[in-house]
C-alpha cells in the first residue's frame, strides 16, 4: 500500500493506493459498503459475505477507505475470545467508521476485546483529511501511526512503524501494554 498525506499531493487530497499480491490471476475489487449498526450477529470460524465474491478493499459513505497487507509476526501468545477476529475487520470498519481515526479506534477495540488470530497484518485507513497505518500481531497487541500530512509512506507487507510515542495521541495509538 502507499499512503500520501494531503500536503504531499498536488491537489491536497489524501491518497491511498493498494495492490493485491496474492498468487494467481486475481482482480482486486473495491466495494462501497453501506452503514450497518446490527444489534447482533452470528459467530463463524470462517466468514463469507453474501454478494461478495472476494474481499479486497472497502470505501464507505464517509470517505473512509481501508485496505490491508499481510505481515508475519513472531507473537506466540495466542489469546482469543470467541475465536478472535481476522478477515471481518475490514468489513466491520467500513460499516461503522466515520473517519480514519475512528477506524483505527475500532480496530484497536476489536483486537483488545477479541484478539487477532492471523499471523499479523497492517491495516491502512484513510479519509479525506488524514491517513493511518495500524499494525496487528497475533493476539491482543496493536499499534497505529498517523501518516503526517507532508509524508508519503509505503507499506510493503512488513511492519513499518519504527518508533512509538503513545503519549502523542494526535499521532499514535496502541495497546496499553506496548
Predicted regions and their residues:
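Generic secondary-structure transition motif, activating predominantly at the C-termini of alpha-helices
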Residues: 97-98, 111
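A contiguous strand-loop segment
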Residues: 1-86, 106-178
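Aromatic- and Gly/Pro-rich donor/ligand-binding loops
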Residues: 103
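Cysteine-dependent hydrolase recognition
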Residues: 94, 100, 118
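Second-shell loop/turn segments in exported
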Residues: 79, 88-97
Amino acid at each position: 500500500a502507499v499512503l500520501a498525506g494531503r500536503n504531499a499531493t498536488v491537489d491536497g487530497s489524501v491518497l491511498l493506493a493498494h495492490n493485491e499480491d496474492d498468487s494467481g490471476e486475481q482482480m482486486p475489487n473495491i466495494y462501497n459498503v453501506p452503514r450497518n449498526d446490527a444489534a447482533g450477529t452470528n459467530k463463524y470460524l470462517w466468514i463469507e459475505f453474501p454478494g461478495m465474491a472476494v474481499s479486497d478493499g472497502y470505501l464507505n459513505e464517509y470517505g473512509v477507505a481501508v485496505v490491508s497487507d499481510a505481515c508475519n509476526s513472531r507473537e506466540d501468545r495466542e489469546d482469543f475470545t470467541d475465536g478472535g477476529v481476522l478477515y471481518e475487520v475490514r468489513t466491520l470498519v467500513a460499516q461503522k467508521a466515520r473517519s480514519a481515526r475512528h477506524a483505527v479506534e475500532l480496530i484497536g477495540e476489536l483486537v483488545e476485546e477479541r484478539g487477532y488470530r492471523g499471523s499479523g497484518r497492517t491495516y491502512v485507513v484513510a479519509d479525506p483529511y488524514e491517513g493511518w497505518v495500524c499494525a496487528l500481531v497475533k493476539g491482543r497487541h496493536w499499534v497505529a501511526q498517523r501518516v503526517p500530512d507532508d509524508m508519503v509512506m509505503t507499506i510493503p507487507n512488513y511492519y513499518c512503524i519504527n518508533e512509538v510515542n503513545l503519549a502523542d495521541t494526535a499521532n499514535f495509538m496502541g495497546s496499553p501494554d506496548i
